[in-house]
Amino acid sequence: MKKGLLWAVVLLLANSTLARAQEESPPKLPSATIQAPAVSQTPAAPAEVAAVFEPRCERPFSIWVNADYLLWWVKGQPTSTPLVTSSTTLTDAPPAALGQGGTNILVGDRLGYGAFSGMRIGLGVELASGLALETNYFLLERRSFRFRAASDANGFPIIAHPFFNTAIGINDALLISNFDPNTGQFTGATAVDAGLRLQGWELNVATAGACRGNWNFKGLAGFRTLSLDENLSIQDSLVNPANGFLSFQGSFATPAGSIIGNVDRFTTSNRFYGGQIGAKAGWQSDILSLDVTGKVAFGATQQIINVEGYSYFIAPGGAQSVTPGGLYAQPSNSGRYYHTNFSVVPEAGLNLGVQLTSRLKATFGYTFMYWSNVARPGNQIDPSVNQTVIPTHPSFGTTPPDGRPAFTSRQSDFWAQGLNFGLEFKF
């Protein structure tokens, strides 16, 4: 009984001490989550900026080929002097020379070729990376300029080639026909012929560009070559109706019915090799497409210029004699000459396409190309000639030659432009 009462007192004291300790302890703080400070990040581009251009314009791998018909025009061949004149009056002295009142210019300072037909074929490969390889080759048909003039049986009208006569210091003319009985009538004919052929090839890498909606933009870099071949010839034929009216190499012993003539030939060959850069913009819808291309090439033009001339005499019996030198081509300027010049070749093109099927497209477009520093045959003519070096001139051999005509490489520019109609097939 006493032990039970003692244990009850001990338990009561222990509970009282525990309660007091709990009341004196500091209040418990509420739990809280501590967050780490935010890490700064590069802000994203505004949505309106990202919508302007996608950084790359990647397309699936594809191959395409195209073929175009070309309808082009080129810059006519310039000449350093009018080549053929005529006159119907006998009061001018000398007749048919430049600056005389009765002189008519029959072939002026530019020879036109008209419209050229041609072709252009191309091949391209679009890589999955967005790069593309493109190549094309074009060729224009060879076209000619032709001029013919002849007098009647009385030598009317006067037909001539004008030149500046360095022996006497005046504008003069070599007569091909003459109807003046006082100086000797003779008949004659002249022919002027010129020809041109143009072709070229290029290989480009098109870089992966930017896009916006239906538009895509690419850069171009590559290599191109061009070839321009041209010629000019002047041929005369004079018939002596009576003894001694015409001379050959200073001799008037030309019987009636004999034929004398002059031949001048000028040819040029231009080869351009250079690197090029450019850009291309394209627009594509489900049916229509538009491509605009601009590029410029820098490089060297290698030139070969050939000058030759001769005169001939054909006797009534058929015996022939040929001597060097015509009119504008004499031993003083004849020969084969080589030159290399720096050239720039810019080109611009516009093409509109219509999708015929999922793989076939019809195209129509326009191209303009310019080429600086080229040699053209007519520019190589020196219009200053000493009359005493012309084998068919009456004054042949009367004074020592003075080196005229002389050869000087004369540069010109060239352009070609026109329309193209074609088809493009994509594999």
Residue ranges and their predicted role:
Residues W7-S16:
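Bacterial N-terminal signal peptides
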Residues T17-A21:
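Sec/Tat signal peptide C-region and signal peptidase I cleavage site
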Residues G299-I305:
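Short acidic/glycine-rich loop or secondary-structure boundary segments that cap or lie
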